[in-house]
UniProtKB/Swiss-Prot annotation:
Transmembrane segments: none annotated. Residues 341-370, 445-481, 734-856 are annotated as: Disordered. Its main location: cytoplasm. It is found in: Cytoplasm. InterPro entries: ARM-type_fold, Rap/Ran-GAP_sf, Rap/Ran_GAP_dom, RGPA/RALGAPB_N, Tuberin/Ral-act_asu. One of its GO terms (biological process) is activation of GTPase activity. This is Ral GTPase-activating protein subunit alpha-2. PROSITE patterns: RAPGAP. Residues 755-769, 776-799, 845-855 have a biased composition (Polar residues). Catalytic subunit of the heterodimeric RalGAP2 complex which acts as a GTPase activator for the Ras-like small GTPases RALA and RALB. The keyword DNA-binding does not apply. One of its GO terms (cellular component) is cytoplasm. Component of the heterodimeric RalGAP2 complex with RALGAPB. Heterodimerization is required for activity.
Length: 1873
C-alpha cells in the first residue's frame, strides 16, 4: 500500500483509530490522518471493514460539536473542527454506498443531514448540506423513503410546496414536522440550525436561482463520487437524481414542456406569431434591466444554461484558477471540506448580485448577463472533466434523453427578448452539431435496423443516404462518445422511467428539420421596438440562426423533406416579419434590420433547393405570393437584383459558354494578356476550384478553407420523363407561331416548366423575343463530371476574396435560336446539335460542370451583403474562426461519396435537370434558364408595385440586367485568337424580353414618372441595337405607339430621356415604317432645344436633327404627325419637313448655348448645303445657311468658329456647284474670309491665347484653298460691295484685297488703319443675301482637357515657352507662306506633271558638267558654274550655268550655255531655266556690244504652241515680235487684262479731245525744230567731232559663270544697293547636309489614312486583311476618295508605301496645292502570304485615322485591328435605303472635328467627299495634340532660318564681287570675259 507516510505511521494511526479506549476526538484526528495519506482503494476496504467504528467516531464527534456550538457559539476553531467532521461524513457516504443503499444508519444520517439543511443555517452550511444530501440520495436511490424525495423536491426555495401524503410540504416542515396529533406526548427533538446565519452574511438576492444552480452543479459533480463496487451504478446515481429533478422541478420551470417532442418522428408544424410579453424596467448601476412577469423565468434560464454546458466546448480550469482578484469565489468551507469540488459561481453572483426582486419570481438580466461568454458558461474545473463527459454521454444515451434535450432547446427558442442571449447559446449548440461535430444521435441509422418505409418517410433516396452516410463517416468520435449503458438493474428498482432504447441514431435530416422548425420561434416573437437593447438582442439572435441556415444551404446534403421544410419556414418567417405595419408612419426596425439578410437567405435557399430536389408548383406559387406582396421593401428589390446578377452569370456560362468575369472582349482589350487560356468558351483547368462563384454571394470569406468538389450521380433516374419531355417538345413546335402574338410577356412566377416549354424558350421564333418562360434543351451534355476532380476526391483549396465587392455590369441572357422564320425550327435537329455542343463544352471545361455553381473570380461577382451582417463575436471560438468562414459556393451540388463519380458516358444522354423532371442536379442549361426566368418574374407584375420609388428602382435594375444581356450577346462568337471568325451563335439572348413590362410602364400615371423614364430609357436602348432577328409587326406597332406618345408628351423629362437615349442609330436600322417617327423626332428635338436648361440632351437633339438632313431628299413624303409651332395643322411633304428641319438647325447654329451642340449644328448645316448642291435643288435657304456659317467665323468661341472654317473649307470642292447656284457665291466666300481675317487680326495679334492665333492661321489656309480653287478671272473681278462711295466708283480686284490683308498679317494690322478702304471690311459684305452682323448667342465654353504623360511634365515649362515664342510669329509666317504660294502657284497648279508634283525635283548636281554623282555631294560646291546666295534673309537662291543642248523653249536665239535658278523658300523649291534672248546670231557677230537679254522659264513646264528654231527664222522677221507672241501663248497668265497678245499694240487711250491732241503735236514739232537748229549751228564745230573707231571683233564668252553673272546684273543684284539683302553662303559639308534635309521635307500638309473593308461575318483581323475586293458600293466609295495612282511612278506623298509592289500596285491619292492624302486601302494591298498580311497590318495599323467600311451585321470593334494608333475611326455602315450611317470613335483627348459627326447619315453622292474632308480634319486634330507639332511651312521656315543664321557669309563688297565673278577661282580661265 503506497502512502505518503511510512508504513509504520499508517499502522499506528490505524491502531489508534480502532482503539476503543481512545477518546473519539483522538480517534477522529488519526482517522483524518489516514484519509489524507491512504489511497482510495485501501480506504474503501478499510471503511468496509470498520464501518461501524468509523461511523461511531463521526457521530460522537458530530454530536459533541453540535452541543459545543450551542453552548459556546460560533468561532474559528469550531468551524475548522466542523470542516474536519463533515469531511469524514463525506468519505463515509462515498466509500459505503452499498451499505447506505440498504438504509444503514438511515435515521441517523437523515437527522444529521436535516441539521445541515436547516434553513436557519448559514448559506455555506446549507450548500454543504445539499452536496452531502445528494451523495446520500444517490446511494439510497430506489430505497429512499418519501421523505428524502420530498426533501430533494424542496431543496430549492421559491417553488410551490410539494404535495405529499401528508399534504403540502416545504423544507422547514420536512426538517421539523409538526405533530400530527395535538396531544401526543412523544415527538422528535426539534432540529435547530447548526451554524446560524450571521447578521452580516451576504445573501443572494434571487435565492431560487442561487440554490437551483447549486443543486444542478452538485448533481453533476457528485455523480461519480460514490465508490461503487459495480462501476455502472455511477451512471444510475445521476439518472436517479435527474429523474427526480424532472419530476418535481421541470413542470414549474417549463409549464409548456411537452413529451411529444420526438426527433425520430418529428412533428414539423410551423409555429405561429407570439405576442411580446410585458417587460418591467428596473435600474441598477445606472443601467436599465429588463425582465418579465413570467414565473420562474430566471430559474428556467439557469436550467437551460446548465443543459447547454454539456454541449458547448468547455474551458477546463485548474484549482488555482478558481480565485478571482485574490478572493475565493466560493465559500471556503466548500473548498476545503469538499476537497476542491468547487461549484462555479453563476454570472448573477458577480458584482454584488442583482437588485431586489419581488416574490413573483420575475426574472431579470442585464445586457452583460445576456451576453454570456463561453468562459462564464462553460468553465469547468479540470478534475471534473470526466464527470461532465459522463453526464453528457448519459444525456445522449437514449431516445428519451435526446428528445428531452431537444425539447429543452425548443423551450429556449420560446424565451422572451430579455433572455434571448441564452437562446443564442442554444443556437451555438445546434451550429456545432450541424456544422462541426455531429453527436451520435445525428448519425444515420443502420439500414438493417430501419424499415424501408421509414426511409421513405424521411425522404431519402438511395443515393441521398449514401451521400449522407459518407459525409458522416468523416466525423469519428472518441471512445467515450458512442457508448451506451444498460439500465436494467436500475429499472428493476424502478428508478428509471425512460423506455430503454439505446439506438439513438436519428440521422442528420431529422435534426435539421427540428432545428428549422424550432428556430423559427425566434423570428415569430413580436419584437419590442420601444426597447432598442432588446430589439438588437433579438435581431442578433435571428442573424445567428440565419447564418446557420446559410451554412446548411451551402454545405449540407438535405433531402426533399428538409428542403421543403426550410423553404416553408423561410416563407413563413419572411411573411410574418416583413409585413409592414398598418400605420405607415411607424418604422419596423426589426424588419428593417433583418430585411436584406432574410430576403437573401430565402432566395438563395430557393434556388439552391431547386438545383438539388424537385420543388412543387404549390411552393413556387407561395414564393411568388409572398414576395409579390412585399415589393414595398427596397431590400427585397436589392436582393432580387443581386440574385439576378448571379443567376445571369450562371446563365451566361452554362447556356452561352461565356464567363462574365472573363469576357472575351475584356481579354482582347487588355493588350498585356497575350496568352489565351483557351479557345472559344473553354475555361482554364487550373481555375477549376474557383469556378462557380457567381452565386456565392460572398458567403465565403475564410481564405484557408478547403472544399471538396461535389458530384451527384446522374444514373439513378430513368428515361420515361425524358420521353415525355420529347413529346411535349414536338407538341410545342406547332405553338411557336401563336406565341409571337404575345411577345415577351414575362410571366410572373412561372411554375414548373416542362422541357417543352424550356425548348421553346431556347428556340424562339422569327421574333427572337422569348414568348414563354425559358429553359435550355442542351442539358444532356452537362452531366459530364469534372475530369480534374473525378480523379481525386481530395478537397481542392479555394482562394477567397474577402469583403464587399462592387457588382460589375455583366451581361446576362436567355436562349434564343437564331432563325428567320418558324419554318426553320427543326427542333429535333437543333436539340441534338445543341446537346452535342454542350457535351463538347462540358468535356473541355475543368470545373464548369454540374458540380459547380457559377463564375470564376467570386470577388467580381459577389454580392457581399452576406458579410455586412457581422456575427456575434462570441461565436468566433478558436475552433470556429468565422461563422461564415467555410460556407460553400452557393447553389452548389451536395457532397457525395467519391465512389459515385461517374463518367459522362455512363450517364443517360437524354436526362435533364431535376427542375425539368429529370434527375440531374446542379447547373445545366435548362435549370439555369428556368431559374433565371422564374426569379425574374418572382416579384409578379412589376408594374403593380405601389411605391413609385421602388418601381423606379426595379426598372433601373432592369436596365442593368438588359445591359448584361447585351454584353453577353456582344461576347458571343468572338474570335479570341483574331485569326478566324467563329460561326454565328446558335443561341442568342432575348434582348427584347422586357418589352411588355416596358410598354406597360410607359402608360402608367405620372406619379410613376421615374419608372417611366427608366422604361423609356430601356426601350430606346433595346431598339437602337442591331437586331439579330427583326421584330414582328405587332411588336413594332406597340413600339411605334409608345414612342409616338413619348415624343409628343407634354412632359419635358420624357422628351429628354428619349432624345438622350435614342441616337440616330435608330434610323439606320431601317425598321419597317420607321419613317413615320421622323416628324415626331424632329418636333421632339426642337422642343428639347427650345428649353433654356443646359442639362437637357441638347447635343443629342442636334445630332438627331443633323442625321436627318439628307432624309427629305431620299423620302419624298415624310409625314409630320402633329401640328408644329408656326403651323396650324399637321403637315406632310418633303419641302415642309425640310424647311422645318433647316429652320431649327439655323436657329440652333446661331443660338445654341451648348458648345458641342453648336458644333454639330454647324456641321449639319454644312452637310445639308453639300446635299442640296449635290442634288441641285437650288433650295433658297442655302444662302441663309452660308450666311450663318460665314458669321460664325468671327464667333468668340474658337472651337465653334474652327468648325465653321472647316465647313467653308469643305465647300471649296463644291465651288462649281455654288457657281451654278449663284455666280457670285464662290467669290463671296473668299470675300467673307478676307473680311473676317481683317476683322479678327487686330485682336489676335496681341492675344495671349494661342487658339486665337491658330484660328487666324486656319482662316488664311482656308482662304488659300479658295484662291487656288477659283479661276483667276474670279479673283481678278472687282469686289462686290453694297455701298460704293463716289470717289471709289471702281473697287480693286479681289486678289488685290487678298494680298493687302496678307500684307497686313505680315506687317501688322496697323498698316491699314490710316488708309481708308485699304482692306475689305465686314460692312462691305453687307447685302440682301448676306448679313455680316447676324447676331450670335454665346455658348458655355468647355474647359480644354490637358493630356500630358508623365514623361512630358518635366518639359512642360520649356514647351510652353517655345509655344509662346512660336505663336508670336505664327500669323506673319503663315501669311508669308500664303503669299509665296500664291505667287508661285496661282494660275499654274496643277502643272503638267499632275497634282502630285508641286515643287521642283531638280538639284544643283543635275545637268552640271563639273559633277559626276547622281546625288547632291560636296563636289557640287567646287563647281565653278555654281554659286549659292541668300536673298532677304528668307530665301536660298542657287545660280547654275549649264551647257545647252541646242535651242530650247522656243528661244529665237541660242547660246552655248543656259542659266538655271533654283529657289528654296518657305513655300517650297522652284527651278527656272534661262536662255539668252538677244545676242549674236549664229555665225554672226554680236551687235555693238549689247548685253544679251534672258528668257526664264520654269524647268518643269512643257512648252506649248508653235515653236521655231532659230534656223527657221526668215530674214526680215521681227524676232522680238515672235518672242512676245510665244510668251503670250505659253504663259497666258502674263497677258494683260485686255487679253491682247503681247506683240499687239494696245488700244488707243480714250478720252483725249481735239485741243489736247493739237497742243501735244505742237510741242513735239517745236522740240524737233529746236534740235535741228542746234545741230545746224554746231555742225562745223571741231570740238563736236570724234575720231571714228572700227567695230571690234566679237569674242566667244567661255567663263563657266558668265551668263549667271549677266543675269545677276540684269536683276540688279550686283549693285551696291542690294548688298544688305543679298549674301553668299558658306559652302561646307554642314550646309550640304542642311540642304539635303531641307529638300527632303514636304512642301504640303500630308496625311495617310487607312481604309478597311469588312464583309458579313468577319470579326477577325485575318479575314478582314485577307479581303482582296469589296462590294460595288465600297469600290465606288474608294474610287470617290481620290485618284488611283500607280505607286511605281507616283511622285507625290507615298505614306510609307513601296514602289516595288510589295504594298500594292495602286492606291487612291488626293491632293490640292496645300494638302496630300494617300489612302492605305486594305483591298489594294497583297495578302497572299503571312508576311504580306504582317506588312499590310503594319501600314494600316500605324495610321492615326481609320476608315472602316463594315457590311457585317455587328458593330465594328476597335480591338479587331490591334494597334496602338488608330486614334480616330470613321466607321461607315451601308443602310438599306442606299444611305450611309457614320459612327465616329475617337480617343477622349482628340478635340472635336467635322464636318461629319458621330451619328451622321449621308447619301452616297456626298459620302466620299465628306469622309475625305473629315479624315483630313481628324488627322489635323490628332496632330495638334503632339507637343510642339509644326506644320510643313513652319518646319521649312525653321530650317531656312537655321541655314541662313549658320551659313550666311559676311564679306566686303570687293570679296563679294570676286566670288560672283568666279565662284571657284581655281577653275577660272584668264581673258574669258
Amino acid at each position: 500500500m503506497f502512502s505518503r507516510r511510512s508504513h509504520g505511521d499508517v499502522k499506528k494511526s490505524t491502531q489508534k483509530v480502532l482503539d476503543p479506549k481512545k477518546d473519539v476526538l483522538t480517534r477522529l484526528k488519526h482517522l483524518r490522518a489516514l484519509l489524507d495519506n491512504v489511497d482510495a482503494n485501501d480506504l474503501k476496504q478499510f471503511f468496509e471493514t470498520n464501518y461501524s467504528q468509523i461511523y461511531f467516531i463521526f457521530y460522537e464527534n458530530f454530536i459533541a460539536l453540535e452541543n459545543s456550538l450551542k453552548l459556546k457559539g460560533n468561532n474559528k476553531s469550531q468551524r475548522e473542527e466542523l470542516d474536519s467532521i463533515l469531511f469524514l461524513f463525506e468519505k463515509i457516504l462515498q466509500f459505503l454506498p452499498e451499505r447506505i443503499f440498504f438504509r444503514w444508519h438511515y435515521q441517523s444520517i437523515g437527522s444529521t443531514l436535516k441539521k445541515l439543511l436547516h434553513t436557519g443555517n448559514s448559506i455555506k452550511i446549507r450548500c454543504e448540506g445539499i452536496r452531502l444530501f445528494l451523495l446520500w440520495l444517490q446511494a439510497l436511490q430506489t430505497n429512499c423513503a418519501e421523505e428524502q424525495v420530498l426533501i430533494f423536491a424542496c431543496l430549492v426555495p421559491g417553488f410551490p410546496a410539494v404535495m405529499s401524503s401528508r399534504g403540502p410540504c416545504t423544507l422547514e416542515t420536512l426538517i421539523n414536522p409538526s405533530p400530527s396529533v395535538a396531544d401526543v406526548k412523544i415527538y422528535p427533538e426539534e432540529i435547530t440550525p447548526l451554524l446560524p446565519a450571521i447578521s452580516g452574511e451576504k445573501i443572494a438576492e434571487d435565492q431560487t436561482c442561487f440554490f437551483l444552480q447549486i443543486l444542478l452543479k452538485y448533481m453533476v459533480i457528485q455523480a461519480a463520487s460514490l465508490e461503487w463496487k459495480n462501476k455502472e451504478n455511477q451512471d444510475t446515481g445521476f439518472k436517479f437524481l435527474f429523474t427526480l429533478f424532472r419530476k418535481y422541478y421541470l413542470p414549474h420551470l417549463f409549464p409548456s414542456f411537452t413529451k411529444l417532442t420526438n426527433i425520430y418522428k418529428p412533428v414539423l408544424d410551423i409555429p405561429h406569431l407570439r405576442p411580446k410579453p410585458v417587460y418591467i424596467t428596473t435600474t441598477r448601476d445606472n443601467e436599465n434591466i429588463y425582465s418579465t412577469k413570467i414565473p420562474y423565468m430566471a430559474a428556467r434560464v439557469v436550467f437551460i444554461k446548465w443543459i447547454v454546458t454539456f454541449f458547448l466546448e468547455k474551458k477546463y480550469l485548474t484549482a488555482t484558477q478558481n480565485t478571482k482578484n485574490g478572493v475565493d469565489v466560493l465559500p471556503k468551507i466548500i473548498q476545503t471540506v469538499g476537497g476542491g469540488a468547487v461549484q462555479e459561481r453563476a454570472p448573477e453572483l458577480d458584482g454584488g448580485g442583482p437588485t431586489e426582486q419581488d416574490k413573483s419570481h420575475s426574472n431579470s438580466s442585464t445586457l452583460s448577463d445576456r451576453r454570456l461568454s463561453n468562459s462564464s458558461l462553460c468553465s469547468i474545473e479540470e478534475e471534473h472533466r470526466m464527470v461532465y463527459e459522463m453526464v453528457q454521454r448519459i444525456l445522449l444515451s437514449t431516445r428519451g434523453y435526446v428528445n428531452f434535450v431537444n425539447e429543452v432547446f425548443h423551450q429556449a427558442f420560446l424565451l422572451p427578448s430579455c433572455e434571448i442571449a441564452v437562446t443564442r447559446k442554444v443556437v451555438q449548440v445546434y451550429r456545432k452539431w450541424i456544422l462541426q461535430d455531429k453527436p451520435v444521435f445525428m448519425e444515420e441509422p443502420d439500414r438493417k435496423d430501419v424499415a424501408q418505409e421509414d426511409a421513405e418517410k424521411l425522404g431519402f433516396s438511395e443515393t441521398d443516404s449514401k451521400e449522407a452516410s459518407s459525409e458522416s463517416s468523416g466525423h469519428k468520435r472518441s471512445s467515450s462518445w458512442g457508448r451506451t449503458y444498460s439500465f436494467t438493474s436500475a429499472m428493476s428498482r424502478g428508478c428509471v422511467t425512460e423506455e430503454e432504447n439505446t439506438n439513438v441514431k436519428a440521422g442528420v435530416q431529422a435534426l435539421l428539420q427540428v432545428f428549422l422548425t424550432n428556430s423559427a420561434n425566434i423570428f415569430l416573437l413580436e419584437p419590442c421596438a420601444e426597447v432598442p437593447v432588446l430589439l438588437k438582442e433579438q435581431v442578433d439572435a435571428c442573424k445567428a440562426v440565419l447564418i446557420i441556415f446559410r451554412r446548411m444551404i451551402m454545405e449540407l446534403t438535405m433531402n426533399k423533406k428538409t428542403w421543403e421544410q426550410m423553404l416553408q419556414i423561410l416563407l413563413r418567417i419572411t411573411e410574418a416579419v416583413m409585413q409592414k405595419p398598418k400605420d405607415k408612419q411607424i418604422k419596423d426596425l426589426f424588419a428593417q434590420s433583418l430585411a436584406g439578410l432574410l430576403f437573401r437567405t430565402l432566395m438563395v435557399a430557393w434556388i439552391r433547393a431547386n438545383l438539388c430536389v424537385y420543388i412543387s408548383r404549390e411552393l413556387w406559387d407561395d414564393f411568388l405570393g409572398v414576395l409579390s406582396s412585399l415589393t414595398e421593401w427596397e431590400e427585397l428589390i436589392n436582393e432580387w437584383a443581386n440574385i439576378m446578377d448571379s443567376l445571369t452569370a450562371v446563365l451566361a456560362r452554362t447556356v452561352y459558354g461565356v464567363e462574365m468575369t472573363n469576357l472575351p472582349l475584356d481579354k482582347l482589350s487588355e493588350q498585356k494578356e497575350k496568352k489565351q487560356r483557351g479557345k472559344g468558351c473553354v475555361l482554364d483547368p487550373q481555375k477549376g476550384t474557383t469556378v462557380g462563384r457567381s452565386f456565392s454571394l460572398s458567403w465565403r470569406s475564410h481564405p484557408d478553407v478547403t472544399e471538396p468538389m461535389r458530384f451527384r450521380s446522374a444514373t439513378t433516374s430513368g428515361a420515361p420523363g425524358v420521353e415525355k419531355a420529347r413529346n411535349i417538345v414536338r407538341q410545342k413546335a406547332t405553338e411557336v407561331e401563336e406565341c409571337q402574338q404575345s411577345e415577351n410577356a414575362p410571366a410572373a412566377g412561372s411554375g414548373h416548366l416542362t422541357v417543352g416549354q424550356q425548348q421553346q424558350v431556347l428556340r424562339s421564333s422569327s421574333t427572337s423575343d422569348i414568348p414563354e418562360p425559358l429553359c435550355s434543351d442542351s442539358s444532356q451534355g452537362q452531366k459530364a463530371e469534372n475530369t480534374q476532380n473525378s480523379s481525386s476526391s481530395e478537397p481542392q483549396p479555394i482562394q477567397e476574396n474577402k469583403g464587399h465587392v462592387k457588382r460589375e455590369h455583366e451581361g446576362i441572357t436567355i436562349l434564343v435560336r437564331r432563325s428567320s422564320s418558324p419554318a426553320e425550327l427543326d427542333l429535333k435537329d437543333d436539340l441534338q446539335q445543341t446537346q452535342g455542343k454542350c457535351r463538347e463544352r462540358q468535356k473541355s471545361e475543368s470545373t464548369n460542370s454540374d458540380t459547380t455553381l457559377g463564375c470564376t473570380n467570386e470577388a467580381e461577382l459577389s454580392m457581399g451583403p452576406w458579410q455586412t451582417c457581422e456575427e456575434d463575436p462570441e461565436l468566433n471560438t478558436p475552433t470556429d474562426v468565422v461563422a461564415d468562414a467555410d460556407a460553400r459556393h452557393w447553389l452548389q451540388l451536395s457532397p457525395t461519396d467519391a465512389s459515385n463519380l461517374t463518367d459522362s458516358s455512363e450517364c443517360l444522354t437524354d436526362d435533364c435537370s431535376i427542375i425539368a423532371g429529370g434527375s440531374l442536379t446542379g447547373w445545366h442549361p435548362d435549370s439555369a434558364a428556368v431559374l433565371w426566368r422564374r426569379v425574374l418574374g418572382i416579384l409578379g407584375d412589376v408594374n403593380n408595385i405601389q411605391s413609385p420609388k421602388i418601381h423606379a428602382r426595379v426598372f433601373c435594375y432592369l436596365y442593368e440586367l438588359w445591359y448584361k444581356l447585351a454584353k453577353i450577346r456582344d461576347n458571343l462568337a468572338i474570335s479570341l485568337d483574331n485569326q478566324s471568325s467563329p460561326s454565328p451563335p446558335v443561341l442568342i439572348p432575348p434582348l427584347r424580353m422586357f418589352a411588355s413590362w416596358l410598354f406597360k410602364a410607359a402608360t402608367l400615371p405620372n406619379e410613376y414618372k421615374e419608372g417611366k423614364l427608366q422604361a423609356y430609357r430601356l426601350i430606346c436602348a433595346m431598339m437602337t441595337r442591331r437586331q439579330d432577328v427583326l421584330p414582328n409587326s405587332d411588336f413594332l406597332v406597340h413600339f411605334y405607339l409608345v414612342m409616338h406618345l413619348g415624343l409628343t408628351s407634354e412632359d419635358q423629362d420624357i422628351l429628354n430621356t428619349i432624345i438622350r437615349h435614342c441616337p440616330p442609330r435608330f434610323f439606320s436600322l431601317g425598321f419597317p415604317g420607321f419613317s413615320m417617327l421622323v416628324g415626331d423626332f424632329i418636333t421632339a428635338a426642337a422642343r428639347v432645344l427650345s428649353t433654356d436648361i443646359l442639362t437637357a440632351p441638347r447635343s443629342e437633339a442636334v445630332t438627331v436633327l443633323g442625321s436627318l438632313v439628307c432624309f427629305p431628299n431620299t423620302y419624298q413624303e415624310i409625314p409630320l404627325l402633329q401640328s408644329v409651332p408656326e403651323v396650324n395643322e399637321a403637315i406632310t411633304g418633303t419641302e415642309d419637313v425640310k424647311h422645318y428641319l433647316i429652320n431649327i438647325l439655323l436657329k440652333n447654329a446661331t443660338e445654341e448655348p451648348n458648345e458641342y451642340a453648336r458644333c454639330i449644328a454647324v456641321c449639319s448645316l454644312g452637310v445639308w448645303i453639300c446635299e442640296e448642291l449635290a442634288q441641285c435643288t437650288s433650295h433658297p435657304q442655302v444662302k441663309e445657311a452660308i450666311n450663318v456659317i460665314g458669321v460664325t467665323l468671327k464667333f468668340p468661341n474658337k472651337i465653334v468658329a474652327q468648325v465653321a472654317c472647316d465647313v467653308l473649307q469643305l465647300l471649296v470642292s463644291y465651288w462649281e456647284k455654288l457657281q451654278m447656284f449663284e455666280t457670285s457665291l464662290p467669290r463671296k466666300m473668299a470675300e467673307i474670309l478676307v473680311a473676317t481675317v481683317a476683322f479678327l487680326l487686330p485682336s489676335a495679334e496681341y492675344s495671349s491665347v494661342e487658339t486665337d492665333k491658330k484660328f487666324i492661321v486656319s482662316l488664311l489656309l482656308c482662304l488659300l484653298d479658295w484662291c487656288m480653287a477659283l479661276p483667276v478671272s474670279v479673283l481678278l473681278h472687282p469686289v462686290s460691295t453694297a455701298v460704293l462711295e463716289e470717289q471709289h466708283s471702281a473697287r480693286a480686284p479681289l486678289l488685290d484685297y487678298i494680298y493687302r490683308v496678307l500684307h497686313c498679317c505680315v506687317c501688322g494690322s496697323s498698316t491699314y488703319t490710316q488708309q481708308s478702304h485699304y482692306i475689305l471690311t465686314l460692312a462691305d459684305l453687307s447685302s440682301t443675301d448676306y448679313d455680316p452682323f447676324l447676331p450670335l448667342a454665346n455658348v458655355k465654353s468647355s474647359e480644354p482637357v490637358q493630356y500630358h504623360s508623365s514623361a512630358e511634365l518635366g518639359n512642360l515649362l520649356t514647351v510652353e515657352e517655345e509655344k509662346k515664342r512660336r505663336s508670336l510669329e505664327l500669323i506673319p509666317l503663315t501669311a508669308r507662306m500664303v503669299m509665296a504660294h500664291l505667287v508661285n502657284h496661282l494660275g499654274h497648279y496643277p502643272l503638267s506633271g499632275g497634282p502630285a508634283i508641286l515643287h521642283s525635283l531638280v538639284s544643283e548636281n543635275h545637268d552640271n558638267a563639273h559633277v559626276e554623282g547622281s546625288e547632291l555631294s560636296f563636289e557640287v560646291f567646287r563647281s565653278p558654274n555654281l554659286q549659292l546666295f541668300v536673298f532677304n534673309d528668307s530665301t536660298l537662291i542657287s545660280y547654275l550655268q549649264t551647257p545647252t543642248e541646242g535651242p530650247v523653249g522656243g528661244s529665237p536665239v541660242g547660246s552655248l550655255s543656259d542659266v538655271r535658278v533654283i529657289v528654296r523658300d518657305i513655300s517650297g523649291k522652284y527651278s527656272w531655266d534661262g536662255k539668252v534672248l538677244y545676242g549674236p546670231l549664229e555665225g554672226c557677230l554680236a551687235p555693238n556690244g549689247r548685253n544679251p537679254s534672258f528668257l526664264i522659264s520654269s524647268w518643269h513646264r512643257d512648252t506649248f504652241g508653235p515653236q521655231k528654231d532659230s534656223s527657221q527664222v526668215e530674214e526680215g522677221d521681227d524676232v522680238l515680235d515672235k518672242l512676245l507672241e510665244n510668251i503670250g501663248h505659253t504663259s497666258p497668265e502674263c497677258l494683260l487684262p485686255s487679253q491682247l497678245n503681247l506683240n499687239e499694240p494696245s488700244l488707243t487711250p480714250c478720252g483725249m479731245n481735239y485741243d489736247q491732241e493739237k497742243e501735244i503735236i505742237e510741242v513735239i514739232l517745236r522740240q524737233n525744230a529746236q534740235e535741228d537748229e542746234y545741230i545746224q549751228s554746231h555742225n562745223f564745230d571741231s570740238a563736236m567731232k570724234v575720231t571714228s573707231q572700227g567695230q571690234p571683233s566679237p569674242v566667244e564668252p567661255r567663263g563657266p559663270f558668265y551668263f549667271c553673272r549677266l543675269l545677276l546684273d540684269d536683276l540688279g543684284m550686283n549693285s551696291w544697293d542690294r548688298r544688305k539683302n543679298f549674301h553668299l553662303l558658306k559652302k561646307n559639308s554642314k550646309l550640304l547636309r542642311e540642304l539635303k534635309n531641307l529638300d527632303s521635307r514636304q512642301c504640303r500638309e500630308t496625311h495617310k489614312i487607312a481604309v478597311f473593308y469588312i464583309a458579313e461575318g468577319q470579326e477577325d483581323k485575318c479575314s478582314i486583311l485577307s479581303n482582296e475586293r469589296g462590294s460595288q458600293a465600297y469600290e465606288d466609295f474608294v474610287a470617290g476618295l481620290g485618284w488611283e495612282v500607280d505607286l511605281s511612278t507616283h511622285c507625290g506623298f507615298m505614306g510609307g508605301l513601296q514602289r516595288n509592289g510589295s504594298t500594292g500596285q495602286t492606291a487612291p491619292y488626293y491632293a490640292t496645292s496645300t494638302v496630300e492624302v494617300i489612302f492605305h486601302v486594305s483591298t489594294r494591298m497583297p495578302s497572299d502570304s503571312d508576311d504580306s498580311l504582317t506588312k499590310k497590318l503594319r501600314h494600316l495599323g500605324n495610321d492615326e485615322v481609320h476608315i472602316v467600311w463594315s457590311e457585317h451585321s455587328r458593330d465594328y470593334r476597335r480591338g479587331i485591328i490591334p494597334t496602338a494608333f488608330g486614334d480616330v475611326s470613321i466607321i461607315i455602315y451601308p443602310m438599306k435605303n442606299h444611305m450611309f450611317f457614320i459612327a465616329i470613335t475617337k480617343k477622349p483627348e482628340v478635340p472635336f472635328f467635322g464636318p461629319l459627326f458621330d451619328g451622321a447619315i449621308v447619301s452616297g453622292k456626298l459620302l466620299p467627299s465628306l469622309v475625305c474632308a473629315t479624315c483630313i480634319n481628324a488627322s489635323r486634330a490628332v496632330k495638334c495634340l503632339i507637343p510642339l507639332y509644326q506644320s510643313f511651312y513652319e518646319e521649312r521656315a525653321l530650317y531656312l532660318e537655321a541655314i541662313i543664321q549658320n551659313h550666311r557669309e559676311v564679306m566686303t563688297f570687293e570679296d563679294f564681287a570676286a566670288q560672283v565673278f568666279s565662284p571657284s577661282p581655281s577653275y577660272s580661265l584668264s581673258g574669258t570675259d
